[in-house]
Structures are given as structure tokens and as C-alpha cells.
Amino acid sequence: MRIKRWVCIALASMLLCGCSPLREKNDISSLLSLEPQNSLSYGEYEPYRATLYYIDPQRNTLSTELREIELVSSVPKGKQIFEELLSGPKERGLEGFGSEYTLKNIDITGGVANIYLLTEQNLSDQKKLALCAALSNTAVDNLGVQYANLFFNEEPAYIAGRPCGLLGKTDLDMASFYESYLEKAAEPVWSIPVALYFLDESKSYILPEVRTLSFEGENYLQEILYQLSLGPEYKHYLVSPLLPNYAFTYQGNFGSIGGDGLLSIDSLQKLFQNGSEQQMRQHMACLYHSFHGVVQGLRSMEFTRGMEKHTVTFSVSQLYLGEEVLLYFPSKDLKHLERFHHVVRSGRAHNLKTYLEELAEGPLKIEQTRALPCFPADMGSEGVLGAEMRDNIAVVNFSAEMLYSLEGMQQDELYLFLYAVVNTLCEDEAVWAVQFCFEGEIIDELGIFSLAMPLYPNIGLAQ
């Protein structure tokens, strides 16, 4: 949660109000402070100030260009930002990277942006590293990630014969950055941050944990497999795809990547617990995406079950990519809010509808020892009619049935419902406060709580 932003906006918050009859008089269009903008979920356009990085040839550093763009809600934000970046600078004195690039795809998962470019340009190592740094800096500043993994023509970026691995944000001049890279590349042991992919607790999605790995020679596959077998280091809610008693040796039954990009896994029973074909694919997806960020030439992985061979490609592996969202649910004693990370399919995070649907689903089974459902017992996501952004206010429109159910809640239940919604939606950096509406209209009060104005997050309720 972005504490500094919450501290600033908390000065403007209006939390509680005295008791008075409900009055459904204020149509939302009468709120002059809520200029219609666009919707994170349903609207068409959203004004956005993008921070784009280009080369300053005078200083040989990366410099920013702030550019006002209109984001189309139906197109992923990352795609639009990087297409703007690749279109070249508009400010004088900045240098772009050429026009022969096509942005193929961007996946955002677990704080990592996987950026895929197609190009026919034959870049020098120094120019490629500068482009990678510009892409990574742009991703960190605009997409809420900590790292970027860069791919050119479906291959992970290699410079000086070594994989770049994950890049964070750099403020070095490009000459020093390149020289530092070459010095490290000349050492016998090559250490880089790598995204290792594990299963989430539900075992429905895969998520990365970033870890610095050291490679000797080209033992990329073996070292990644060994690290996966150790399990996550700090994301303890993730699960290793490998058997806990897996004994790795460098002479493991692993095979090698063929000329057609096929990696054949021979000893499946020594790697994974026996499961359904789909579970095996999910486990293989962990391996595929972990290898894919470092190893060149990988196009598919094959495993055999019984007499049948099964293939996992990039497009299959991509289906299992997840993304974390932070949700708030009432505590069992109804005295505070409990925080939980849920995993949704990559691309569904930072969407008002997704947050509300997850709240309506309630806490997971393993969370129910600490938390209660947020929504009334007789109401699910059907109680949400819509949600949109107006300036930095999330306007959530509930049904009349939801209003009726909320009116039947006890005071502490209602209080925690309101702030479970507010705190959850305000986890998105674009949302500062939440305006509650019912059938398109603002009501003055619900119980003893004022809803005439937007509610700001309550940090003190969260534990």
C-alpha cells in the first residue's frame, strides 16, 4: 500500500457523520468535483502522463520525457505506453532507438514485466543494453513493477554472450553501465536476477519470485531446476512445482534443447507429484517460464505420461500466469480488516471489476480462520451494477437489493464492509477515494455513516 499517498489524501477524508434519515436525492451528475473521465473497467479513454526514457546524447544518459497520452481502456496499458516509447521522442535533444520495432506482447506478473519485441535491426551490444535499460526504466515507472525481462524475436536478451536476466531501474550513464556489464561478463561466475516461477496456493496460477542466481559456464537449465527444487525463499505462500524430496544432480535425466527448440523431460515422475494432465502442464509451465527468461532457443517442452506425449509451448505456459491483488476482509471479531493476497489471471489486476468480484467471492478457505465475508450473506457480485473512474475517485454503483441487504447489517459489519471496499480499491495507485452509489444515485447516509461524499482509505483498520 502506498502509505505516502494515503497520508496526503487522509487529510481530506470525511469518515463519519451523525445519524439522519436516508435521502436519495443527489444524482451523481450533480457532483461538480467528479468530472467524468474514463473507467478502469468500462470507460473508453483515460488521460495519462507517461514517463518515457530516451538517450540524451549530450550526456550519454537516459533522460525522461513526460508525455500526455489517452489510454484506451480496451487495450492493455503497457502495450500503449511502449508503443508510445518506440514511436520516438518528441522533445528536442533526445534520441530514440529507431523505428524497426514491433511490440509483440507484454505480460505483467508478480512485479515483473515480460516485454517481447520483434525487430530486424542488428543492434550492437552497447545499443541493445541501452534499449533494455530504457524499456526497463519505463516499465518500472509506469507499470508498478520492480523488474523487466526483455525478449528480442522471442529470445531472452543476451549481451556479450551472457543473458541479461531481469533489469531494474538504472540511473548510470550508458557508457559506465555497459563497461560494468562487460566486466561482470568476463568473470567465470555470472550472477543475475532471475524470475523463478512457482505455483500459487490454489495451484491454479504461476507467479515469479525474483532471486539472484550464479551460473558457471552454461549450466542455466541445471541451476534453475535446482533452485526451483529448493522452493520459494520469501514468498512463502507459493509452492514449488517439484517434489520436496527431489534430489538434483548435474547428470540428471534432463535431456537437452534440440535444434527445433524442443526440450524433452524424461523423468517426470522424479520431478513432480503424480496428478492430472492439467496439473502436469501447470508444473511444466513453471519450468518453461523459469527457463524461458534465461535460455535461448527454447520453443517447447515435452513430457510423456503413459504412452502419450504432451507438449507445453509458450502460449500454453502463458495461460497460467497470475498476478497478485491485495484484498481486505472483516476480521472474525469485527474489530479490524485482515489483508490477503489473492491471485488472478495476469491482465485482470488493476481493474475495478476484478477487485469487486474478488471481494464478493469472499475469503479463501484457508483465510476463513481469520476473516469473514465482506458482502452480505445473500448478495454476491450481482449486487454490483458497475464501477468507473472519475478523476481519482472510483464510483461504484450497487443495486437496490444490495442497499436493502446492507441496511440489515449491524453497525460494525457495515463499517467494515464500507472500508473493505474502500481500502481494496485504493490499493490501485489511480484510486484515491471511493464514492458509493445505489441504482446510479448517491444517498446521504447508510446507517450512521455518511455516504454523501467519497470515502478515503482508513489505514488504521488494516492489520
Question: Language-model segments: which ranges?
Answer:
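Bimodal "functional hotspot" detector
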Residues: 6-9, 15-463
